[in-house]
Amino acid sequence: MDRSPTSRRRRSLLKGAGAAAALGVAGFPAIIRAQSDAIRIGHLTPRTGFLGPLGEYAVMGVNLAVDEINAAGGIMGRKLDLIAEDSVNPQTASTKAERLIERDKVVAIIGEISSASGLAIAQVAQRNRTLFFNTGCNSDELRGKSCNRYMFHTEAANSMYVSACGQALLRDGMVKGKKWYSLTADYAFGHDLLKVAKRFMTANGGEFAADELVATDVADFSPYMLKIRNAKPDLVVSNLAGAQITNF
């Protein structure tokens, strides 16, 4: 479900800062001792495409965290060397994750916003036995059947957000006997979020009047607005992402 622009900006900054800070407490001394002077880590996040605006905030956050850690003397006396890449899409994310590990010899990868790209990176990390800190992917699948021992999460799952928002809506009488109309981003994150939201509605006596999958490159929401007006739902639910939210 959608969150305010201020909240999204704050979360994006915290995601990057939290991820780099996590490296400071994670330890893995055996890996650190095997490296040269600096501790090299990779950061993958979309900086172009419909998630690009969110990615820019993630970049600001991780740069801030790395600068603060290095200014304080680094980790165990060693500075962090950050290598950042634009992940763009799942295929590119997978390719760049492989390159960061094999060519750049990073000890860990942090980042992502796209759940589909996060899954691709997680598979590469598992195959290469490299740590992956997920700082922005919300899909429950990444914490369930697709989770692995090399992946750690600093961001909440879709089910957590649905439960929190849902309890507030239950309190205000906006669930039982009500009809919702959802617009959902047509990729892994959106599909997962819609599934969780439907499960919540079914369990609490509500229903969806309709649910529309929206392509990630859609800029004109006029046709959807007309459908919503005709459906007369009690609540419109935005399961959109990135530039979709602004355009809607």
Question: Where are the language model's segments positioned?
Answer:
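C-terminal segment of N-terminal export signals and the immediately downstream linker at the start
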Residues: 28-47, 51-54
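N-terminal secretory signal peptides
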Residues: 1-9, 16-26
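Glycine- and acidic-residue-enriched helix-capping/strand-helix junction motifs
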Residues: 50-60, 188-192
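Short, polar/charged alpha-helical segment
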Residues: 54-75, 198-200
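Extracellular/periplasmic Venus flytrap/periplasmic-binding protein
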Residues: 140-141, 149-248
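Residue-level signal for short, function-critical loop segments
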Residues: 47, 88, 184-187
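Short helix-capping segments at alpha-helix termini
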Residues: 69-76, 128-130, 147, 201-207
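Beta-alpha junction/loop-to-helix N-cap segments that form part of ligand/metal-binding clefts
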Residues: 53-58, 74-144, 154, 214-221, ...
